[in-house]
């Protein structure tokens, strides 16, 4: 595939992969990953441990070479040095020099980028303010809590106003207030045109901020699309007593269920079948106390997809 021209690169997706594959000896870590991340969108990359998420990120950052397939980042082949200067990255495992102040850590990364020295103070001030550390810039990192260090790591990722930011579990060390702050930062990034590639196990958080999601398992995408496209299912929770084990089993004709005590949730039940369900429960000797429509959450859909896969 020929390299795009400057005009094409500027209008191309933030990320585009075609059958991206990575093998380590006889182990397939990534098996034909194909996906597109538009610019200016928040993209959730989800999957269980061992699904291939970390391998995919390393390939996109140019830290690993693919076994097969292609990956383009900001219109250029993954790993292109000039393109990497336009990318911010917060790794899941972050550790900064404990003897340096927050400002010194940010200055070090300004130098590594490298950013023009004349812009350093402005960049550092903006990063500290954005992540809520404006009054701690002179303090040594060794005095910071883990949550404060994660905020600092996010500040590092934002230096230079990148066009694409990879965030790997960006709120794992934060309290609820900190998580709320980071969600706001992520939304602000998207509003200014920055694409955000978000890897998080906090699915409720992903549901709140992401425009688009891909679910991966065993190194391949098993579902993807906008949040609206992914969460199309309907569910109904019924509180019922008096059903025998056989009676409850016979209700499987109404679709997958999740039972807990007196409550049975039918995870893929169309609304027009609810009267039929209630009538069947009564016929089986059940006493129905409550029927509640339930919005399908991203966690519901995620678990359902993994079960089906």
Place the predicted regions along the sequence by residue.
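Short acidic-hydrophobic catalytic motif
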Residues: 228-232
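ABC-family P-loop ATPase nucleotide-binding domain
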Residues: 1-21, 308-309
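ABC transporter nucleotide-binding domains
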Residues: 12-17, 22-217, 221-223
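Intrinsically disordered, low-complexity boundary segments flanking structured domains
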Residues: 222-227, 279
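A general boundary/transition motif marking the beginning of the first structured unit of a protein
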Residues: 8, 97, 112-116, 174, ...
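Alpha-helix C-cap/termination motif
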Residues: 189-192, 233, 284
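Short, charged/small-residue-rich alpha-helical element at the C-terminal edge
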Residues: 235-305, 309
């Amino acid at each position: 595939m020929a390299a795009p021209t400057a005009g094409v690169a500027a209008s191309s997706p933030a990320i585009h992969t075609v059958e991206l594959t990575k093998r380590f000896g006889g182990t397939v870590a990534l098996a034909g990953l194909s996906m597109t991340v538009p610019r200016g969108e928040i993209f959730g990359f989800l999957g269980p441990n061992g699904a291939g998420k970390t391998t995919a990120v390393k390939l996109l950052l140019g830290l690993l070479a693919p076994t097969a397939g292609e990956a383009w980042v900001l219109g250029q082949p993954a790993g292109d040095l000039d393109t990497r200067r336009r990318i911010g990255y917060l790794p899941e495992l972050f550790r900064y020099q404990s003897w340096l102040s927050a400002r010194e850590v940010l200055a070090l990364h300004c130098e590594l980028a490298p950013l023009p020295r004349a812009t350093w103070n402005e960049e550092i001030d903006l990063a500290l303010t954005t992540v809520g550390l404006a009054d701690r810039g002179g303090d040594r990192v060794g005095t910071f809590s883990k949550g404060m260090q994660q905020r600092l790591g996010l500040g590092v990722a934002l230096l230079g106003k990148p066009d694409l930011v990879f965030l790997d579990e960006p709120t794992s060390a934060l309290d609820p207030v900190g998580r709320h702050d980071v969600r706001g930062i992520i939304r602000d990034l998207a509003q200014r045109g920055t694409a955000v590639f978000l890897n998080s196990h906090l699915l409720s958080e992903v549901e709140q901020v992401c425009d688009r999601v891909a679910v991966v398992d065993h190194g391949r995408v098993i579902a993807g699309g906008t949040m609206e496209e992914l969460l199309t299912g309907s569910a109904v929770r019924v509180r019922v007593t008096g059903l025998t084990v056989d009676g409850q089993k016979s209700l499987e004709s109404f679709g997958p269920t999740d039972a807990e005590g007196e409550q049975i949730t039918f995870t893929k039940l169309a609304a027009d079948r609810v009267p039929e369900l209630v009538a069947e429960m009564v016929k089986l000797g059940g006493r129905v106390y409550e029927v509640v429509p339930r919005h399908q959450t991203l966690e519901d859909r995620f678990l359902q997809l993994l079960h089906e896969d």
